[in-house]
C-alpha cells in the first residue's frame, strides 16, 4: 500500500485520467473528490462490497428450455 500525505486542496494522480483531491478535513473525517472517466466505477468500499455480494447471490438461469 502506498501511503501519501496531502493537504486540503492538494491532488494525487492515478494513471493519466483519475485525480483524487482532498477537499476538507473535519475531526476524523476527510472529504475527497474523485475525478474519473465515466467508464471507471468509483464507490465507497461498503457500497462496492454490497454490489459484489448482490452479484454473487444472483443465480444464473437454469438451462431448461
From Swiss-Prot:
Under the GO molecular function aspect, what terms does this record hold?
Answer: mRNA 5'-UTR binding
The record's annotation in InterPro entries points to: CsrA, CsrA_sf
Tree of life domain: Bacteria
Amino-acid biosynthesis as a keyword of this entry, yes or no, is no
* Compartments where found: Cytoplasm
For biological process, the GO terms are: mRNA catabolic process; negative regulation of translational initiation; positive regulation of translational initiation; regulation of carbohydrate metabolic process
What keywords would UniProt list here?
Activator, Cytoplasm, Repressor, RNA-binding, Translation regulation
Instruction: Please name the Gene3D superfamilies in this protein's record.
Output: Translational regulator CsrA
Recorded GO CC terms: cytosol
Record text on subunit structure and interactions: Homodimer; the beta-strands of each monomer intercalate to form a hydrophobic core, while the alpha-helices form wings that extend away from the core.
Q: Which PANTHER family match?
A: CARBON STORAGE REGULATOR
Instruction: Identify its protein family.
Output: Belongs to the CsrA/RsmA family.
Extract the HAMAP family matched here: CsrA (MF_00167)
Please give the function described in this protein's UniProt entry. Answer: A key translational regulator that binds mRNA to regulate translation initiation and/or mRNA stability. Mediates global changes in gene expression, shifting from rapid growth to stress survival by linking envelope stress, the stringent response and the catabolite repression systems. Usually binds in the 5'-UTR; binding at or near the Shine-Dalgarno sequence prevents ribosome-binding, repressing translation, binding elsewhere in the 5'-UTR can activate translation and/or stabilize the mRNA. Its function is antagonized by small RNA(s).
Q: Can you say what this protein is called?
A: Translational regulator CsrA
UniProt organism field: Marinobacter nauticus (strain ATCC 700491 / DSM 11845 / VT8)
- What broad taxonomic lineage does this protein's source fall under? Bacteria, Pseudomonadati, Pseudomonadota, Gammaproteobacteria, Pseudomonadales
Amino acid at each position: 500500500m502506498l501511503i501519501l500525505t496531502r493537504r486540503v486542496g492538494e491532488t494525487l494522480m492515478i494513471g493519466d485520467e483519475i485525480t483524487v483531491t482532498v477537499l476538507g478535513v473535519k475531526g476524523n473525517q476527510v472529504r475527497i473528490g474523485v475525478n474519473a472517466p465515466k467508464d471507471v466505477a468509483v464507490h465507497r468500499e461498503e457500497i462496492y462490497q454490497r454490489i459484489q455480494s448482490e452479484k454473487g447471490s444472483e443465480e444464473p438461469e437454469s438451462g431448461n428450455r
